[in-house]
Amino acid sequence: MGQIFSRSASPIPRPPRGLAAHHWLNFLQAAYRLEPGPSSYDFHQLKKFLKIALETPARICPINYSLLASLLPKGYPGRVNEILHILIQTQAQIPSRPAPPPPSSPTHDPPDSDPQIPPPYVEPTAPQVLPVMHPHGAPPNHRPWQMKDLQAIKQEVSQAAPGSPQFMQTIRLAVQQFDPTAKDLQDLLQYLCSSLVASLHHQQLDSLISEAETRGITGYNPLAGPLRVQANNPQQQGLRREYQQLWLAAFAALPGSAKDPSWASILQGLEEPYHAFVERLNIALDNGLPEGTPKDPILRSLAYSNANKECQKLLQARGHTNSPLGDMLRACQTWTPKDKTKVLVVQPKKPPPNQPCFRCGKAGHWSRDCTQPRPPPGPCPLCQDPTHWKRDCPRLKPTIPEPEPEEDALLLDLPADIPHPKNLHRGGGLTSPPTLQQVLPNQDPASILPVIPLDPARRPVIKAQVDTQTSHPKTIEALLDTGADMTVLPIALFSSNTPLKNTSVLGAGGQTQDHFKLTSLPVLIRLPFRTTPIVLTSCLVDTKNNWAIIGRDALQQCQGVLYLPEAKRPPVILPIQAPAVLGLEHLPRPPQISQFPLNPERLQALQHLVRKALEAGHIEPYTGPGNNPVFPVKKANGTWRFIHDLRATNSLTIDLSSSSPGPPDLSSLPTTLAHLQTIDLRDAFFQIPLPKQFQPYFAFTVPQQCNYGPGTRYAWKVLPQGFKNSPTLFEMQLAHILQPIRQAFPQCTILQYMDDILLASPSHEDLLLLSEATMASLISHGLPVSENKTQQTPGTIKFLGQIISPNHLTYDAVPTVPIRSRWALPELQALLGEIQWVSKGTPTLRQPLHSLYCALQRHTDPRDQIYLNPSQVQSLVQLRQALSQNCRSRLVQTLPLLGAIMLTLTGTTTVVFQSKEQWPLVWLHAPLPHTSQCPWGQLLASAVLLLDKYTLQSYGLLCQTIHHNISTQTFNQFIQTSDHPSVPILLHHSHRFKNLGAQTGELWNTFLKTAAPLAPVKALMPVFTLSPVIINTAPCLFSDGSTSRAAYILWDKQILSQRSFPLPPPHKSAQRAELLGLLHGLSSARSWRCLNIFLDSKYLYHYLRTLALGTFQGRSSQAPFQALLPRLLSRKVVYLHHVRSHTNLPDPISRLNALTDALLITPVLQLSPAELHSFTHCGQTALTLQGATTTEASNILRSCHACRGGNPQHQMPRGHIRRGLLPNHIWQGDITHFKYKNTLYRLHVWVDTFSGAISATQKRKETSSEAISSLLQAIAHLGKPSYINTDNGPAYISQDFLNMCTSLAIRHTTHVPYNPTSSGLVERSNGILKTLLYKYFTDKPDLPMDNALSIALWTINHLNVLTNCHKTRWQLHHSPRLQPIPETRSLSNKQTHWYYFKLPGLNSRQWKGPQEALQEAAGAALIPVSASSAQWIPWRLLKRAACPRPVGGPADPKEKDLQHHG
């Protein structure tokens, strides 16, 4: 330790006396950054200067390096000036801390501490030090610790507690010198600190790393592992240094003081039970651990580190050194001291003392258990009242009103004191003025303190109220001075008995001894821009009564600095705050769209516009990434407009939901607000600042002419036009500015939409006051107002494209409708768009608009010419007449709102009006919904909801009465019989409904008083009447349909008419057939006025019921047929009944419905053997089972061109495989490839080895998930096997597949692929399957793969017959189970033979035996392999042997040594 890079070995220079160690560390790190490195002479001169500076009366804590630089004499030897310059540049990165709370009065002794209560926890003050600065010349590669290095570091920190300034100074220099990795730092922590400190440090470091990873670290890749792992790489210097800073910062947050707490020294006795030791630790932590500190990691760490040696060995042996506490207790519960028995020591609870409790004065309990609060230690130092603490003193809570600020006073309300340090990088909740960058051009705005703007016409003087605790509060004018370390107050504010001390002060006039005194009494200062008072523990007193200065000690509690704005700007201008959310917070890659070339005229205009924007401060030069093209557009008056194409940025931006529902309805402006004024903001978007991090998304390039040089890059500083979230952001900012004005003038109204503002007031005087306040607020926030566009009554008021008159509204521009039949599509589309804009004031129904909308449909080319029919031309005439009457009334607040809803075939028209008014308030049009049926009740309910929503949103009222054109009978029938969801809505609003009745023809003259030529609205009546009971005198009509045919039967005691007919092409559907059958039936029953209709189609049944209750025809594919139903059912009385089909009931309704269904049925003919073979390519035996003779089947096979070739599945020898003893005993699985039409299919095949039944599925991959899916489908098809046998492919040996087999209790084994002995069955099955697939695709090349595979499985499993048992695979798979043959049954008397044998599964070449077979069967023999067990041996491992002759007996010449194979 003590070694510095590029320097000889020398001890670390010691700090001068009186300077804190962490401040000295800052000076050392700044000195080590000098190039070349510092010398001993530099350190000597630095210590000499600091010693002189520490002796000055003005203390430098918190230290101010700028003040030190000002005290440095010119020509001072050494490089002290360079060191201070480095510190001044680095100090801006460290946030200052608030002043400590005022200490209690020293005149009173602290209360006696209670021995039963642990001392309170005091959190150490974190040292204020600069970040680790790696000096120049540091080695590029990291050097790991050596043991001598660790010993040297430990020797220097042996007398310092972890987190103390001396400890942090040594550790920081060690980190600076060795540049350690994360593992090196962990080794250093374990070597230096106890396990408790290491555990707490590890926990704090984890939380810091989590915050840093969330915030984002340069060079950190989340996919490469956690930060600890990446910081271990010596090549990752950036990440390593980030980890070093976090590791050092974790020491500053360690709980506890410099000494170890009392509970850290609790050790387990040599004979103490482990559970008693843990209990003592738990109680000590509960009493002494600071609040908020987690107890569990500390308890686990101490439970191991402070245990005795024997318990530590037990915990190490079981691996429970840092396990949960329960595991540690179980590991040590059986431990007892050597040569001693287990003793349970029970300590009795100590009785409470006889003395009374000092809190409540009562005896019988401990003071720590008392519920009363702790009494104050003595009289309050502020008011000398002994009944409360100083923190509860009423003098700290001002009761007198605060002084009113003057017009030019400060406007900011700084935050109050808080017990924890604030993060000043965010400005303490304040907003900086726009000229802050001009005042401090070299500072980063994120690191500047909040500012206090002052009046440039006056000195920085403010009014303050001072309370010296010895006299009444007084108001004085004080000078704000950031150069004064302490606040100075005149002696006139203090009483004569105030204790004052002599002091010397060094100021601008030199040093003085008797001018100022020092007082230690707390002083309360109330400032106009602060809601809570400032408490100063001491201040200077001017004995000559000349000065009142607010110094840095007071301003530091305000967390602000002074700022004097330029003389050009008003003194109280505050900018609009930058938006908190822009829609680009996810920071995608900025767009890089190349700038397209411009002609010389446009390029010159663009350069002129850019120069004007640069002078206005809207843009600035830029060199970063991102680009969007720009171009100028020439306006009608000859000037140019700057256009920035931000479509690429808009595509990356998240839409912000706007709180504005749209432009306000000006008809809601009451007639009582007759005095109006408009305010138009100029370049409103250019007043919202744009954060720096979003500039790449709004950058552009101005090219040079003919590409003579690189273009000039710029980026927006403010919110540009063309950004899709700009209107929403500006609306939110403007609404925030206008909200105080709205609250100050409740009798007036302010309408705001985008950058247009309308002021409405009941009197001219109120309008002037409202206008003045609004203008002042807008100007104070930097929003320029266009004076030439301001309008005021009396006079014409044009706002949002409308002209506001005293009692009505008109549109500024009403379109002119030319009457002609030929239109270009863009012309008609533009005309209808203009008509739609003024439709709220146009007295017309929906029909003329719908007629012209239909003319725009079915056109795909924008250049098409549209030819209108006579009815559409007539619609143009009606619209021109209606536009001539375009006018709307303004709201009369004394009259109720009325509504009229007219339902027509083309849509709904809703009118909101007031009685006795010449014009309505608004006309609303809505098209029919996109459904096949539009019930009148549903349309009425939707119109009512739309009407209520609009009137509440625009007028704040509901319509008192709603007129509609549905007849009363139809309306009541819909309410009583319909189950539509709109019925509850209509019932809820039924008290407001009123039927127009006979007044429909006179609607316009009776209610609206309009002269517009509008057609009368007819009352709506249903097409036919629905009878609730069956009609005895009417015939019965049955109809039905299928996808290909339709039929009906007309019956009246006998079948009068019946017919079945096919559907006409090209569209064929069951609904179309059912509708067509009903239409033919109605056509045949046209002569009857009454009719009973029986339908088994729910679609037609509900359609007819809705038609009977009243409906309009909507959009449907069956619209031409549905339009015929009203004509055929007109004025009929119909009984409608739904029939359930295929019930086979004996009643006549079911019988006639079944007879109708029979007319649709086409008989199904069985396939002939030749057709069956052409479809499936099944075998000869399958054809004979389907009725063909053997000769016919043979001829069919010979005539099939696909079956004449050889089958590839027979090319593999049959071999011998292990087969199952019953179905679903053993399966074999494999994946085979089948390529067709450039698509490679993976066929997952499973074969039952007993029956040969196959299950196959086609997949596109060979993954484990596909293999699992195919096995599950096979189990659903064939059943669950006991064993499965596959090859060792990756899909079958994966962990997922094995886990699935284990969960299903299936045993999985593997075999050698392409081996006739082990995998022959599944390989042959693959060949059979692919042969059939090739045949199918040869016959039908377009056959889907799923269909071909299904036909092949049907053919193999259900049609083809096995030659050995004359059954199909499916029959064999589902055949009855045979009784198992036990191996222990009595042996037969059949003659057995002697065999040599080899045991299965062994590779031995030596034959064993001979042994006499106990039993022989097909394929194996039961051989006694030992004295106590026998085993079935297959024939391939047996060799026939002669019977051994008895001892001494002759050999039998007939016996031969034979070898058998199965």
Swiss-Prot record:
Residues 93-144 are annotated as: Disordered. Residues 614-804 form the Reverse transcriptase domain. It comes from the Viruses. Residues 1031-1165 form the RNase H type-1 domain. Changing residue 486 to V: Decrease in protease activity. Residues 476-554 form the Peptidase A2 domain. The RT polymerase active site binds 2 magnesium ions. Its EC number is 3.4.23.-, 2.7.7.49, 2.7.7.7, 3.1.26.4. Gag polyprotein: Late-budding domains (L domains) are short sequence motifs essential for viral particle release. They can occur individually or in close proximity within structural proteins. They interacts with sorting cellular proteins of the multivesicular body (MVB) pathway. Most of these proteins are class E vacuolar protein sorting factors belonging to ESCRT-I, ESCRT-II or ESCRT-III complexes. Matrix protein p19 contains two L domains: a PTAP/PSAP motif which interacts with the UEV domain of TSG101, and a PPXY motif which binds to the WW domains of the ubiquitin ligase NEDD4. This is Gag-Pro-Pol polyprotein.
